[in-house]
Every structure is written in structure tokens, then in C-alpha cells.
């Protein structure tokens, strides 16, 4: 059985410790010795000092990933709306495996509780990841109608404020290394969200300005755009699709309720800076399905998260 805690190293930061002047004044100076040690002894001493310094050297900041946190993150993808959003992104330009791993890292850096693993927080973190990593600005705008519903044009300025609040909550540490993403994915490597590979021809900052204009965002009511590079029908495999279509009335009602909650969260006048407003936008309308998708049932790597604590 695997350990309950997994470690994922993040880019190290530099900490400078400065002693106060009062402490320096009371320090006794050691006499300077000019004796030259024997060469062999000095070589062994230098090796021992190097090993001691290496062992005493503080390690960089790390993420301690709890089992229940990863489980709560995976449960987000049981939501029909999020599944349909992934189905729409058939070329993995908005939510490939690295952007999804960054989303989880943001949840950790923000110290989200289990109750804060909500749909709206997922879209906010994913939008921030796209802002940091992607050079093509237009693609990420597709997140607006999925997260905010039909009134997204009125609500997206507030959505951007929530993104900035999340950025502040993670202490503006929005850069996530490739190694950190891969270590997060290595916890459950066969989960279907880590199979979302982006094709090479969709990588980089090279743009084709002669392409047919596609007005973005298109929203949940539209079908994925045919991609001549990925194939006319797009890549719909291994995305964890839901049985409901993206144009279902239930999905539309859920999005409308979420947009109303987001609007009401900003309509309240508060004195001072409200702590973590975006965490107050509760997602009470996620899917009521208790059964996981067939793919997750066959995914044995997730059993580690489903097992009870011994």
C-alpha cells in the first residue's frame, strides 16, 4: 500500500537570514590561526565539510499531497459540465495534462480545503494557468461561457477579479515547473486527465493568420471546431466523456444558477477586502451521479485514493 503523503518539489526560493547588529557586538572573535595543515588532512577535512554542508542544506519548498486532496480534485471531473468542456477542447489547447496539473498545484498553493474544490475555482485556476503559459490569448476565452453561463459578458470582469485574488492567495507563485507537473501526474499516471496530450502542431507560438476566422468564445451550445491537423472529427478519445450532450437543458440550468451565484457574490457591499471571495461561490449543482465513468472504473491507479485509511 502506498504512503498517504506524496512529495512534489517546486522551484526553490532563496531565503536570506540577516543577523541583528546587537548580536554581532557581543560575539567574541576567534583568533586567526596561520598554521598550514597537512595536505592530506586538509583534503579529507574539505570532503567531510562538503558532505556535512550538503546534508544540512535546506531543501526547497515542497508540496505535501494528501490522498483526500487528490481524490477531491479527481471528483471535479465527474461533473457533466467539466466533462463536456474537456470534450469540446478536443485538441487539448485549453486543458492539456500540464495545464490541468498546474490547476491542481494552484489548489495546493492556495491551500484550498476540500469544500473549495468547486467548479468555479477549477475554471479560475485553469484560466490563470492559461494566462501564464499560453501565448495564444483567444483560446482561453472559451472558459468564460462554460464557467459563467449565458450572462458571461456581464460577469467576466468579476471572473478576472477572482483570478487576481487567486493569484494573490498563492503569493504570486504562478510558475509551475515541468518537473513538478510530471511528479503530480506520476501519483496516478493512468488517470484519463493525464492522457490529454497536446499535438506538436498545436505547440509553440506560431500562428496561422490565413486560417478561417473562428469567433471565440463559442460556448457550450456549439460543437468542437473541426481541426484539419488533428482530423476532421477532432480527438474525442480518452477524454472521460459524459453520457449527456453539451447542449442538454440540465447543463444549461446548472450554468445559469452558477452565474447567478457569481453575480450575487459581487453584488454584496463589504467593508475592506473580503477574504477569498471566490471560495465563497459554492458549487452546489455538481453532478449527482454516484457511479464513476467506465474508464475510471477500469483505472486501477485510482484505487489508491479510494481505499480507506488503515
Curated annotation (Swiss-Prot):
Outcome of swapping residue 89 to A: Abolishes interaction with CDK2
Region (Disordered), start-end ranges: 241-310
Tissues and organs where the protein is expressed, per its UniProt entry: Expressed at a high level in testis. Also expressed in the adult ovary and in immature oocytes.
Region of interest (Speedy/Ringo box), ranges: 67-199
Residues recorded with modification Phosphothreonine: 223
GO cellular component: chromosome, telomeric region; nuclear envelope; nucleoplasm; nucleus; XY body
Keyword Ion transport appears in the UniProt entry: no
Phenotype for residue 107 to A: Abolishes interaction with CDK2
UniProt cross-references to Pfam families, sorted A to Z: Spy1
Outcome (variant: residue 102 to A): Abolishes interaction with CDK2
Alphabetized UniProt keyword annotations: Cell cycle, Developmental protein, DNA damage, Nucleus, Phosphoprotein
Compartments, record wording: Nucleus
Phosphoserine PTM sites in chain numbering: 221
GO biological process entries: DNA damage response; establishment of protein localization to telomere; G1/S transition of mitotic cell cycle; male meiotic nuclear division; meiotic attachment of telomere to nuclear envelope; oogenesis; positive regulation of cell population proliferation; positive regulation of cyclin-dependent protein serine/threonine kinase activity
Any one GO molecular function term: protein kinase binding
Domain of life: Eukaryota
Family classification: Belongs to the Speedy/Ringo family.
Domain writeup: The C-terminus is required for CDK2-activation, but not CDK2-binding.
Subunit: Interacts with CDK1, CDK2 and CDKN1B/KIP1. Identified in a complex with CDK2 and CDKN1B/KIP1, where it interacts primarily with CDK2.
Function (record text): Regulates the G1/S phase transition of the cell cycle by binding and activating CDK1 and CDK2. Contributes to CDK2 activation without promoting CDK2 phosphorylation, by inducing a conformation change of the CDK2 T-loop that obstructs the substrate-binding cleft prior to kinase activation. Interferes with CDKN1B-mediated inhibition of CDK2. Mediates cell survival during the DNA damage process through activation of CDK2.
Name of the protein in its database record: Speedy protein A
Species of the source: Mus musculus
Amino acid at each position: 500500500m502506498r504512503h498517504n503523503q506524496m512529495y512534489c518539489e517546486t522551484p526553490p526560493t532563496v531565503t536570506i537570514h540577516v543577523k541583528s547588529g546587537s548580536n554581532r557586538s557581543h560575539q567574541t572573535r576567534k583568533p586567526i590561526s596561520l598554521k598550514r595543515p597537512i595536505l592530506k588532512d586538509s583534503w579529507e577535512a574539505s570532503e567531510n565539510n562538503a558532505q556535512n554542508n550538503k546534508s544540512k542544506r535546506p531543501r526547497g519548498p515542497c508540496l505535501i499531497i494528501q490522498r483526500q486532496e487528490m481524490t477531491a480534485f479527481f471528483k471535479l471531473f465527474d461533473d457533466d459540465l467539466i466533462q463536456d468542456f474537456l470534450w469540446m477542447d478536443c485538441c487539448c489547447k485549453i486543458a492539456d495534462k500540464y495545464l490541468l496539473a498546474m490547476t491542481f498545484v494552484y489548489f495546493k498553493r492556495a491551500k484550498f480545503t476540500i469544500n473549495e474544490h468547486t467548479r468555479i475555482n477549477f475554471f479560475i485556476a485553469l484560466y490563470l494557468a492559461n494566462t501564464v503559459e499560453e501565448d495564444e490569448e483567444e483560446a482561453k476565452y472559451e472558459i468564460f461561457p462554460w464557467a459563467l453561463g449565458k450572462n458571461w459578458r456581464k460577469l467576466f470582469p468579476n471572473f478576472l477579479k477572482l483570478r487576481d485574488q487567486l493569484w494573490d492567495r498563492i503569493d504570486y507563485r504562478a510558475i509551475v515547473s515541468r518537473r513538478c507537473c510530471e511528479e503530480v501526474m506520476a501519483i496516478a499516471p493512468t488517470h484519463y486527465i493525464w492522457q490529454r496530450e497536446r499535438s506538436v502542431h498545436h505547440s509553440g507560438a506560431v500562428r496561422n493568420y490565413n486560417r478561417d476566422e473562428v469567433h471565440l468564445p463559442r460556448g457550450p451550445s456549439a460543437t468542437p471546431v473541426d481541426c484539419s491537423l488533428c482530423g476532421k472529427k477532432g480527438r474525442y478519445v480518452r477524454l472521460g466523456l459524459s453520457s449527456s450532450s453539451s447542449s442538454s437543458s440540465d447543463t444549461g440550468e446548472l450554468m445559469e444558477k452558477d452565474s447567478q451565484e457569481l453575480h450575487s457574490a459581487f453584488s454584496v457591499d463589504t467593508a475592506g477586502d473580503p477574504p477569498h471571495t471566490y471560495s465563497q461561490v459554492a458549487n452546489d449543482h455538481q453532478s449527482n451521479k454516484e457511479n464513476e465513468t467506465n474508464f475510471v472504473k477500469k483505472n486501477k491507479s485510482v484505487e489508491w485514493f479510494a481505499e480507506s485509511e488503515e
